[in-house]
Amino acid sequence: MPLAMNLWSLTLLPGQQYPTYVRRDFQITNAALGEELRSKDGRSVVKVTHNPISQSMLESDDEWSDEDEDEEILSEEDDGEMEVEEVKQKKGKKAEKVEEEDSEEEDEDESDFEDELEETNVLCSLTAGKTEQASLNLTFVRGEVVVFEVTGDNVVHLMGNYIQQDEDSDDESDSDFDGEDDYSELYGSDDDLELDSEEEAAVAKITEIPDEPTPKTKKALPAADKKPVPEAKPAQKRKAEELESPAKEDAALSKAQKKKLAKKAKVEGEKAEEKPAAAAVAEKPATKKEAKAPQKKTLPSGLIIEDIKIGDGPVAKTGKRLGMRYIGKLTNGKQFDANTSGKPFSFVLGKGEVIRGWDEGLAGMAVGGERRLTIPAALAYGNQKIPGIPKNSTLKFDVKLVSIN
């Protein structure tokens, strides 16, 4: 049974055609008249021109890759049939030839486009005041090209969902599975994350930050303890010699003057010991500041946002297309979805293409940043039962923003 994902919609204006190349599997479930009716009793007929096209027909079989060109050139050089300059000239000519062939193929594809779309079918008929909406169950798979249109005077809205088709269990366990352009893209995730120990890696990144200055502090403390020992002793010894030297040179030096000199030597020795001790104390608050805990806040909706790493790139705003990496888990630690390699998941923020917890939790995030979102059921799938996600489940996502378009 297909798994319904984020929303799909299309608004049909009378008299216009809407060619659509299906990049992700989707299902149309409802057609309805618009809020404002141009014709109070007019009849609107929704039609689709449909003809599946295999993926192989959309891709060029004659494309030249750089590796193919290099292998051919190296082979010719080894045979001694071409000089270096001739190789370069041939490569340039082939590149021009490839561009011309690609251009001709594109023109042929465009010219054949109209001929390939042969079948036109009526999806439903809507009449204002009588039948203003109709339930549908139509599925369009990746690689198809369809054209939607409506006849009549009223606007019609088509609604549905992107879907995840059933796959083998082996494919589902692979992080880089075949449905990457549909289900994997829904949430998305950088290649530096791993499926089995993602949370531990994220925590390790945080704890390593305050641990870096710790060895410096430990090394500085013994050094501070050692410094006053050699400095204080020579100072005291020097002052003692100064006491003895005047005593030998000038026997008339009074006892009061000797005591004064001895006291001065003692004070200087204590100051020498206090300076490194104060430096060691000053290092401790600095270490505490560096070991700053991750920023965590709870929104009125119950969504908990924890900034693991603050990014330094562009900031995510409503209407921007984000590229994401992510790992989704239940509160018991069981992972139900992830995107950690391949093409990052791409979606437009704030347009309802993902669950509300993502639309709210990713706003204000900067490229390069990492967050942990704890999303209550009301902002996720609610009481819906989805494979791998029980009803009324609180979800946890470790997300990383990798791009903004």
From Swiss-Prot:
Inhibited by both FK506 and rapamycin. This is FK506-binding protein 4. Residues 49-117, 164-297 are annotated as: Disordered. Belongs to the FKBP-type PPIase family. FKBP3/4 subfamily. Residues 319-405 form the PPIase FKBP-type domain. One of its GO terms (molecular function) is peptidyl-prolyl cis-trans isomerase activity. Gene3D superfamilies: 3.10.50.40, Nucleoplasmin core domain. The lineage of its organism: Eukaryota, Fungi, Dikarya, Basidiomycota, Agaricomycotina. PPIase that acts as a histone chaperone. Histone proline isomerase that increases the rate of cis-trans isomerization at prolines on the histone H3 N-terminal tail. Proline isomerization influences H3 methylation thereby regulating gene expression. It is an enzyme of class 5 (isomerase). Its EC number is 5.2.1.8. Pfam families: FKBP_C (PF00254), NPL (PF17800). InterPro entries: NPL, PPIase_dom_sf, PPIase_FKBP_dom, PPIase_Fpr3/Fpr4-like. The keyword Nucleus applies. Residues 238-252, 265-276 have a biased composition (Basic and acidic residues). Its main location: nucleus. Keywords: Chaperone, Isomerase, Nucleus, Rotamase. One of its GO terms (cellular component) is nucleolus. It catalyses: [protein]-peptidylproline (omega=180) = [protein]-peptidylproline (omega=0). Binds to histones H3 and H4. It is found in: Nucleus. Residues 59-84, 98-117, 165-201 have a biased composition (Acidic residues). It comes from Cryptococcus neoformans var. neoformans serotype D (strain JEC21 / ATCC MYA-565) (Filobasidiella neoformans).
